[in-house]
């Protein structure tokens, strides 16, 4: 996992998509035009967390290196240092795999 030169703010998380399988279990190769974007990724960077009503910092539950699942339309796609990444709020993450 390459270190990126970007620090997200507040409760935002930077995620790199994990490539989907290019072949089905039955051996059929899926063309790029038929592939859906994967909804699984690896956390690359995390912000410090959000603040509650009293102003107290609430740290983020996920950490760098976690493998996460997120919604189909979650996050904003960016390109940073030649890598396609997603920036999303922690609340867009549905869970940690493994």
Curated annotation (Swiss-Prot):
Q: Which UniProt keywords apply?
A: Chaperone, Cytoplasm
Q: Name one GO molecular function term.
A: ATP binding
GO BP annotations of the record are:
chaperone cofactor-dependent protein refolding
Is this entry keyworded Cytoplasm?
Answer: yes
Q: InterPro entries from the entry?
A: Chaperonin_GroES (IPR020818), Chaperonin_GroES_sf (IPR037124), Chaprnonin_Cpn10_CS (IPR018369), GroES-like_sf (IPR011032)
The record's similarity note reads: Belongs to the GroES chaperonin family.
> What is the protein's known function?
Together with the chaperonin GroEL, plays an essential role in assisting protein folding. The GroEL-GroES system forms a nano-cage that allows encapsulation of the non-native substrate proteins and provides a physical environment optimized to promote and accelerate protein folding. GroES binds to the apical surface of the GroEL ring, thereby capping the opening of the GroEL channel.
Subunit structure, briefly?
Heptamer of 7 subunits arranged in a ring. Interacts with the chaperonin GroEL.
Q: What is this protein called?
A: Co-chaperonin GroES 1
